[in-house]
Amino acid sequence: VVVITGASSGLGLAAAKALAETGKWHVVMACRDFLKASKAAKAAGMADGSYTVMHLDLASLDSVRQFVDAFRRAEMPLDVLVCNAAIYRPTARKPTFTAEGVEMSVGVNHLGHFLLARLLLEDLQKSDYPSRRLVIVGSITGNDNTLAGNVPPKANLGDLRGLAGGLTGASGSAMIDGDESFDGAKAYKDSKVCNMLTMQEFHRRYHEDTGITFSSLYPGCIATTGLFREHIPLFRTLFPPFQKFVTKGFVSEAESGKRLAQVVGEPSLTKSGVYWSWNKDSASFENQLSQEASDPEKARKVWELSEKLVGLA
């Protein structure tokens, strides 16, 4: 059994379909919009019985806890958890907030997943599947040792003062580095750096004792995905051909879904603490993370601040 957050569209749906089609995986589609996810699974041709749709709104920590309770009541084993759902609001100049009053990009992409993964770690440990995994979807945009990661505004967590202040925007900053002005594109990139730091911190704290594989991946640029739905129309028109012909980083949703499915089930990809990428021939390789995204001291601080913000400390 694999749980995939944000499986109602894009990469999450493509991976859910790829895994369900193997006949070996039952996919739990953990989605904010139950109806949309059910329709999407049917439209994708996923066979009845190969998936279960469950409600999860990562913008509410109560909803995360309710999902975990509901999943346990369903008495399914948990063999792999995929943290995939993401909010990207690149043109936003004002923050929006989660139910707890935390800036939305970091609240959903990082903190909601952080709580979910911490709670479900117990379930992963109970599974007798020999290759249990926790997979966090990263992004090249948060990795400043790549071309795409150097497109401004660059990810930068600074000294984490905004995160320490709870990212409320009211009493302090809604940006992790404490910047007074809000930038939606940077908030997304910062949240993905938090994802990558979290994966490594999970690896350091739990891999040796549990044998669980903790990994992250960048499945390639899915230029046609709905993740870009808030971008300016000109960008949406120009970006796919630019990716396809200029940077050659373009992959279809189906191909990216297969890549995520590989990281979920492929026996050769069991190494823990790794950030997987794919080359032009679609061969997987271990990618280097930027200095900030692989800073163990920063990872520890993000972990400890996140524990407080989700009520685990």
From Swiss-Prot:
EC number, UniProt record: 1.3.1.33
Pathway: Porphyrin-containing compound metabolism; chlorophyll biosynthesis
Substrates-to-products reaction catalysed: chlorophyllide a + NADP(+) = protochlorophyllide a + NADPH + H(+)
Gene Ontology CC entries for this record: chloroplast
Alphabetical UniProt keywords: Chlorophyll biosynthesis, Chloroplast, NADP, Oxidoreductase, Photosynthesis, Plastid
Keyword Cytoplasm: no
InterPro entries, sorted: NAD(P)-bd_dom_sf (IPR036291), Prochl_reduct (IPR005979), SDR_fam (IPR002347)
Location in the cell: Plastid, Chloroplast
GO MF annotation list: protochlorophyllide reductase activity
Any single Pfam family the record assigns to this protein: adh_short
CDD domains tied to this protein: LPOR_like_SDR_c_like (cd09810)
Kinase as UniProt keyword: no
GO biological process: chlorophyll biosynthetic process; photosynthesis
Reported function: Phototransformation of protochlorophyllide (Pchlide) to chlorophyllide (Chlide).
Family: Belongs to the short-chain dehydrogenases/reductases (SDR) family. POR subfamily.
Name the UniProt record assigns to this protein: Protochlorophyllide reductase
